[in-house]
């Protein structure tokens, strides 16, 4: 009840489902009186956006570089995290320095930062409300949804589409 969990999905493009850990709420909700993890859980998928603008984009403008959202589709976001400058080990020389990296582990901190910005803008929001706000405002105009989630934590019913591959889509903090 005190935070949002942002989990990096795996980077195995040939897998057909989200990693087990990225989809934990799918496997444990309601099991043996477990907590509903999906209330404040976001899985981050690794993709590359090759278009020039999300306005008018289509699925052909995205290249999935990791696992699909799959079982985590109802709380999954897509982030282009192919060229992120990060500190880390570059080679076997044990020298740490900034390098350009990619992967869902580079996208999860981006989404965590978005949650932090939303919590600053909406300090009275619960973790579930912050999660719902981010998922419900994601840009999904570039794919065909296969299902809908109805978000009700803000007092109104807001439907937002998702699909098995792309989850809810790309986060849109300006929405």
Q: Where on the chain are the PLM-derived regions?
A:
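C-terminal subdomain of the subtilisin-like protease fold in secreted/lumenal serine endopeptidases
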Residues: 40-43, 120-175
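Active-site neighborhood of phospho(di)ester-bond hydrolases with catalytic His/Asp-centered motifs
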Residues: 6-10, 44
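A short helix->loop->beta-strand "cap" motif at the edges of active sites that frequently abuts
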Residues: 2-4, 39
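Extracytoplasmic, non-cytosolic globular domains
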Residues: 12, 105-114, 129, 134
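Extracellular S/T/G-rich loop segment that most often corresponds to the catalytic His/Ser-adjacent loop
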Residues: 25-116, 120
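Residue-level detector of functionally special positions within alpha-helical transmembrane segments
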Residues: 10, 103-105, 167, 172
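Metal-dependent catalytic neighborhoods of phosphoester/phosphodiester hydrolases
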Residues: 18-23
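Acidic glycine-/aspartate-rich tracts in secreted/extracellular proteins
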Residues: 10-13, 48-50, 139-142
């Amino acid at each position: 009840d005190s935070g949002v969990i942002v989990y990096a999905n795996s980077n195995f493009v040939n897998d057909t489902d989200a990693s087990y850990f990225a989809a934990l709420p799918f496997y444990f909700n309601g099991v043996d009186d477990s907590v509903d993890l999906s209330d404040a859980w976001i899985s981050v998928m690794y993709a590359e956006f090759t278009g020039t603008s999300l306005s008018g984009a289509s699925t052909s403008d995205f290249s999935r570089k990791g696992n699909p959202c799959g079982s985590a589709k109802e709380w999954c976001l897509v982030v282009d995290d192919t060229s992120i400058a990060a500190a880390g080990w570059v080679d076997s020389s044990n020298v740490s320095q900034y390098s350009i990296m990619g992967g869902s582990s580079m996208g999860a901190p981006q989404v965590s930062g978005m949650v932090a910005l939303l919590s600053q803008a909406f300090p009275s929001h619960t973790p579930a409300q912050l999660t719902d706000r981010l998922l419900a405002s994601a840009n999904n105009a570039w794919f065909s949804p296969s299902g809908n989630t109805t978000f009700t934590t803000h007092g109104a019913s807001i439907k937002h589409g998702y699909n098995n591959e792309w989850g809810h889509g790309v986060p849109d903090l300006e929405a």
